[in-house]
C-alpha cells in the first residue's frame, strides 16, 4: 500500500475572518478548525505523517491535544504560503505528498481515496476540484462586467493537492526564484510544465475564510457524521 505525507500550512493570519486569533484556531463545536482537519487526515491509513507548518510566533498549536501526536511533526513557515509549503516539504520522506489547507476541516475519506488513486495515473499529480456551476463574469477595475466567461472547462480548485514530493519542491523553488505569485501548489506545477489531473471532489469541502463560514462548516461536519 502506497503511503503519503500530508503537509498542512497553518502559518497564515486569516485577516478576512476578523478574529482575535488565526482562523485555524477558532472553534467548531468542541474542537478547533485545525483539530478537525488533522483528525480527518490522521484517520486515513495511507497518511503516515502530517507536517504542520506554523508561524514562528504561534503560541496556540502547542496547547492542542494533537500537538504531541506521534504522526504529527511541526515546522516553521514563512511570510507566504509557498514558502511555508516549501519548508514543510523538507520534512517529507515519502515519494508523494498531499498539501491540504488547515482551514478545510470537512475533507472526507472518500475524497482522499479518490485523490490518492490518481497517483497511479501518472507523475503530474492531481488536485481535488469541483466543476463551476454558476455563471462566471469577468470584470474591469471598476467592478463592471466586461464579459461572460464560458464555464464548460472551469473548475474550483480545492485541497488536498497531491504531487511527487521532489517535483513539487523544485517547482515551488523555481517559482519563488522567479518572483511568481503561486496561489496554490498546482500553479507551481503548471508553470514547471506539468498538467495535474482534476479529481472531482465534494462541494462541501469548504475553506473557512469568513465569519459566516463557521456556521456552515459546523453544519457540514454534523451532516457528515450522519452519513
Curated annotation (Swiss-Prot):
Keywords: Isoprene biosynthesis, Nucleotidyltransferase, Transferase. InterPro entries: IspD, IspD/TarI, IspD/TarI_cytidylyltransf_bact, ISPD_synthase_CS, Nucleotide-diphossugar_trans. One of its GO terms (biological process) is isopentenyl diphosphate biosynthetic process, methylerythritol 4-phosphate pathway. It catalyses: 2-C-methyl-D-erythritol 4-phosphate + CTP + H(+) = 4-CDP-2-C-methyl-D-erythritol + diphosphate. Its EC number is 2.7.7.60. PROSITE patterns: ISPD (PS01295). Belongs to the IspD/TarI cytidylyltransferase family. IspD subfamily. Catalyzes the formation of 4-diphosphocytidyl-2-C-methyl-D-erythritol from CTP and 2-C-methyl-D-erythritol 4-phosphate (MEP). This is 2-C-methyl-D-erythritol 4-phosphate cytidylyltransferase. The gene is ispD.
